[in-house]
A protein has these predicted regions:
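A short coil-to-beta-strand element that immediately follows conserved catalytic motifs
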Residues: 109-117, 255-259
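Active-site-adjacent alpha-helix immediately C-terminal to a catalytic or transition-state-stabilizing loop
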Residues: 275-334
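Acidic, metal-coordinating catalytic segment for phosphate/diphosphate chemistry
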Residues: 2-54, 60-62
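Unchanged
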Residues: 88-111, 119-170
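Active-site-proximal alpha-helix that buttresses catalytic centers in soluble enzyme cores
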Residues: 86, 97, 184-269, 298, ...
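Nudix hydrolase/Nudix homology domain
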Residues: 2, 18-19, 79-80, 143-197, ...
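Conserved Nudix-box catalytic region and its N-terminal flanking loop in Nudix hydrolases
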Residues: 65-109, 201-208, 213
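Short beta-strand scaffold segments in enzyme catalytic cores
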Residues: 53-57, 322-325
Length: 346
């Protein structure tokens, strides 16, 4: 994946005396590319990491870019203009952090979209790593509070001028590129959670159930997937796929549409049919969840990459309970974000 170090990096220039307001001086940005990924253990990517997450909050009509406004938040403690974000709490994923912190700071409910990347900068004796998404405001109301006393909704060019920090400006510029090619469909492509060992299962493999960890993964997928406001759920035939998204279906109050074309067997025996079924989900528009197996997922994504505008040249990963957030415009893949696990990052 682009801009994703595979080993712990040293804190950039950390003197032990730097504050949040010094982040431009020694900060780094990892915002390049429409292919983004979160490491399996993001807290170990840098030394003494403080993890945080947030979003570029926006409102307006993406089909009319001139109507888009973004939220600039004023923090009285720092007397600065910045983006909504906050630190990870125990027992939550980065996606959950982004949604919770936005609600706490601004009062707004959001629907997350594209992962923009991350910024990295030293604060005191730690390395602060902040992941940013785009986040469409879908409800709620701002009430001034101790953390944020004012919010200004501005067109992007005015927001860029108001922002205090260059790092935040670069996040905004990345969001602007995403707004210029708006998503008209998004698929949350989930691999089923962990199931009982195949070698110790004597029955029909389609009936092999989730194990204890798999059941926890399926429960933790609910807040993660809900952050993107899915409208419908599809699943391959195996029960481990259906059971992975069953808690989400209960939360949404909807049925899971089961189709054999989303499974590994279809990818082997009827690749054309499997591609057609996935294309139907794209053409339905909006946001959908598709739960599948580990064999078909890399194949479908590679096919989408070849057909779209997003080249993916490296190995396509699909850990159990992982999520690929796939973004489409006019039926073509324009963005892909890999979230390797729904489990807490701390």
């Amino acid at each position: 994946m682009e801009d994703m170090p595979t080993h712990a990096s040293k804190t950039p220039g950390n003197s032990g005396k730097l504050s949040e307001q010094d982040k431009d001086a020694l900060g780094e940005k990892f915002l390049t590319g429409r292919l983004q990924a979160i490491p399996l253990k993001p807290q170990k990517e840098f030394e003494r990491t403080t993890l945080a997450a947030g979003a570029v909050l926006w409102r307006g009509d993406v089909k009319q870019p001139g109507t888009i406004e973004v939220a600039c938040i004023h923090r009285p403690h720092y007397d600065d203009w910045s983006l909504a974000k906050g630190k990870v709490d125990p027992d939550e994923s980065l996606v959950q952090t982004a949604v919770r912190e936005i609600k706490e700071e601004t009062g707004y409910d959001v629907r997350l979209g594209k992962l923009l990347g991350k910024t990295v900068y030293p604060v005191k004796k730690t390395t602060k790593v902040v992941y940013y998404w785009t986040g469409e405001v879908v409800g709620g109301e701002f009430v001034p509070n101790n953390e944020v006393d004012e919010i200004r909704w501005l067109p992007l060019n005015e927001a860029l001028e108001l922002m205090t920090y260059d790092l935040d400006r670069e996040v905004l510029q990345k969001a602007q590129k995403r707004f210029n090619t708006p998503a008209d469909a998004r698929i949350l492509y989930v691999r089923h959670a962990r199931a009982h060992d195949r070698n110790k299962w004597s029955g029909d493999d389609n009936l092999r159930p989730l194990d204890k960890k798999g059941r926890r993964q399926s429960e933790m997928l609910v807040p993660l997937l809900s952050a993107f406001a899915p409208e419908r759920i599809y699943s391959a035939v195996p029960e481990r796929c259906q059971h992975t998204v069953a808690p989400l279906a209960d939360e949404m109050g909807c049925e899971v549409v089961v189709d054999k074309q989303f499974g590994d067997d279809a990818w082997i025996a009827d690749m054309v049919g499997a591609k057609h079924a996935f294309k139907d989900v794209i053409e339905a528009g909006g946001t959908s969840v598709v739960c599948a197996q580990g064999g078909i997922i890399p194949g479908i994504i590679a096919w989408l990459s070849a057909q779209g505008t997003l080249p993916i040249d490296e190995e396509i990963r699909a850990k159990k309970a992982s999520v690929w957030v796939l973004t489409f415009h006019d039926g073509k893949l324009i963005g892909a974000d890999y979230i390797p696990s729904p489990l807490p990052v701390l």
